[in-house]
């Protein structure tokens, strides 16, 4: 793993839904529901796009992210299937 940068689950998830343009529902800590597609993100915020408008959402305000359809980030472990 020398030279490789380990990616956390949050970045892996956000990058997957961004690349595949998967529609999301994002619930904020104050109860507001936002919907759209992630176009960009960094350590502190997510850029959400819907109907030609963009919203910059700070990650500390996000409670839950629900993708529009199931997301598989990793290949299933064959040893887990045999157990």
UniProtKB/Swiss-Prot annotation:
GO annotation, biological process: regulation of DNA-templated transcription; regulation of RNA stability; regulation of translation, ncRNA-mediated
SUPFAM superfamilies, per the entry: Sm-like ribonucleoproteins
Classification via InterPro entries: Hfq (IPR005001), LSM_dom_sf (IPR010920), Sm (IPR047575)
Top-level taxon: Bacteria
GO MF, one example: RNA binding
Alphabetic keyword roster: RNA-binding, Stress response
Quaternary structure and interacting proteins, as annotated: Homohexamer.
Name of the protein this chain belongs to: RNA-binding protein Hfq
Annotated gene: hfq
